[in-house]
A protein has these predicted regions:
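Repeat-based scaffolding regions
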Residues: 1-130
Length: 130
């Protein structure tokens, strides 16, 4: 039996596939109430952008950035701040949040997020030289 989280996520995907943006936002809000994943806020911001609700999208991106920062994902938080800043380049609040995050975090901590290692794929179309 599927979990309630999975069921709601499937409903979200159905609404997104049909371009039912408002219904998708409603379901994503329900999903966020169950599981406070910052990526859900990012997706809500994306949908709000599609609806030309720039100010609401910025607020979603800022909320996601704050959640990422609280959890220690500084690089992801900075990326969300940059996304919000792209929508409103003159917003001093966003700039100050970014600067505070940078100042409170040493360079080593900015690079702490795990990077998935994948070994290089073998070259299959190489020509052997003798």
């Amino acid at each position: 039996m599927a979990s309630i989280r999975t069921i709601i996520a499937e409903k979200v995907q159905e609404h997104l596939n049909r371009a039912n943006w408002k219904e998708a936002i409603t379901e994503m809000e329900r999903l966020f109430a169950i599981h406070q994943d910052p990526l859900i806020r990012v997706r809500i911001g994306d949908v709000r952008r599609k609806l030309n609700r720039k100010d609401e999208a910025i607020q979603e991106y800022l909320l996601a950035a704050d959640l990422f920062a609280e959890r220690g994902f500084v690089v992801k938080a900075l990326a969300q701040y940059r996304l919000a800043l792209r929508l409103d380049p003159t917003n001093a609040d966003i700039r100050s949040r970014m600067e505070r995050l940078r100042l409170n975090c040493p360079v080593e901590k900015l690079k702490r997020e795990p990077v998935e290692y994948r070994p290089p794929e073998p070259i299959t179309d190489a020509i052997l030289l003798y």
